[in-house]
Amino acid sequence: MNIQYTSLFILLFCPFLFLSAQYTDELNSNRPGASQGAFSVGKRVLQFETGLGFGKEKHDLRENETDAFAFDYSIRYGVWKEELEVSLMGEYQSNSITNFKGSSPYEYKESNFRSNTLGVKYLFFDPYRKMVLEGPNVFSWKANNTFQWRDLIPAISFYAGANFDTADNPLTPDPIEDTPLENESSISPKFVLSTQNNWMGGFVFVTNIIVDRITTDSPTYSYILTLTHTPTDWFSIFVENQGIKSDFYADQLFRGGAAVLINENFQVDGSVLLNFKDTPSRLFGRIGVSYRFDMHDSDEYIEDKGRSGRKNKKE
């Protein structure tokens, strides 16, 4: 895929600029998976999501093994509108690598940021707000308790951010290879299209289509599919698949785990990551927490916006 296809991708999806709103009484965390849900945290909500990861990688071609420690973080804040969220997300990783080439193994260490991204997400289509306002169908039990075709229509958001990569970073691709900028710090764009379906029975399905670092010599194209199930009000489990395509790194990753909602503003979680290749093979365990400071005061509804909303207020 090249820059022309990337531009076409953005042009195809940007026109869907509808209005909606979202706020939940309970914490709305992206953890413990890697995907971004379509919904923002809500206006005047400040949320922190962070975790620790411990894992091992083994690369058969390079004949080395890596013991890794990772710290990931996300700071999210709902500002101006219910649909709008600004965030700082990133991950710092420290590797202890043992190389088995030659007659005697030797060990070395490397550490840096795998990512450090400042961005904005906007929820531009939310079919669930209309469903909530309409209320249940008082004439049909079946309509309220069985699958409906409209359940396939997801909420949709768009994220645009900037990656801030440090110089001489072994964990990120060089911005422009074979030039004086090869080992310099760089800023590159990241775009994410997110969809979210909230289905009956406590199932939530999230998809992400990601275009990352397209101005560098190693652009990354990926997708994430996340299925979450909440059997109770306080406990959830998830499975996730992530596909990554890049000259720097390509893989198929699989995650699974659980989260426990301690109270409406605090969540703890744990997850496992693995893949099925040997260049490298990866196995990671992660634990994390999410906490929000809820300063939200009032919801903005679709009916409150535009000409009809102003007319209703005058009446």
Predicted regions, residues:
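Bacterial Sec-dependent N-terminal signal peptides
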Residues: 1-27
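Transmembrane beta-barrel domains of Gram-negative outer membranes and organellar outer membranes
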Residues: 22-214, 218-315
